[in-house]
């Protein structure tokens, strides 16, 4: 069954621990508040892409249930698709046990099952929440198979988050010319790094995209998470809730979809040195020499 072309298929990518699932769920909750009909397809083996929507530890995954039944064809849509906050439809694809098989298989199996069983009916946005620092064929599947059309990379001013963002941009570029996938922007999930906004705006420019929004750091996010809720539900009148609404509105109205221009590692390191995130080799050598001298005394 083909997917209605009017449905906007977006994906959130980002390195592990960056706050990708938290950012995506809070943003999608805000979009649902604005009347958008949302389907979330969790593509992370942790199966934590929907827990704030459902107020639960982790949703039972398509792959887990299929293994219990013997085949994915034995499942009913209602068993794997639950309804959460503001009517958001929630599915987790799941993955195999650690060290066994390819986690990408769960993504492929789940998406095919959902398409064939009508999960994409009556929705405005389908959102794929994808583990982003593993750039393998399975995790790239929403891009490779021309499912996700708009990619949003959750990053911060930390070196590894930026490194992952550049890698993801490289993955998007690989499939941009054969399909319709485009980069919608970088979402800076703040880590309070010095000059963070300027740094991510500079990286975005180098990648031929935009920093679509800067999400400030606020403990209310953790308070809501402890109660397994989105900020929009836990503290709807909070400043942080409004930040997610601003981001949601920007995504809904975003037409700035570009083919990215990933940079070489040397250029990324030069950028990090320029902003004081990374020491130059010369300065690092001086620091090591100074440390060695002080120890010998």
Curated annotation (Swiss-Prot):
Record flagged with keyword Cell cycle: no
Pfam (any one): Fer4_NifH
Signal peptide positions (record): none
Catalytic activity: N2 + 8 reduced [2Fe-2S]-[ferredoxin] + 16 ATP + 16 H2O = H2 + 8 oxidized [2Fe-2S]-[ferredoxin] + 2 NH4(+) + 16 ADP + 16 phosphate + 6 H(+)
GO BP field: nitrogen fixation
The UniProt record lists the keyword Amino-acid biosynthesis: no
Cofactor dependence: [4Fe-4S] cluster
Post-translational modification: The reversible ADP-ribosylation of Arg-105 inactivates the nitrogenase reductase and regulates nitrogenase activity.
Cofactor binding: number and manner: Binds 1 [4Fe-4S] cluster per dimer.
Binding-site residues, [4Fe-4S] cluster: 102, 136
Disulfide bonds, paired cysteine numbers: none
Binding residues for ATP: 14-21
HAMAP family per record: NifH
Function: The key enzymatic reactions in nitrogen fixation are catalyzed by the nitrogenase complex, which has 2 components: the iron protein and the molybdenum-iron protein.
The protein's name: Nitrogenase iron protein 2
Organism expressing this protein natively: Nostoc sp. (strain PCC 7120 / SAG 25.82 / UTEX 2576)
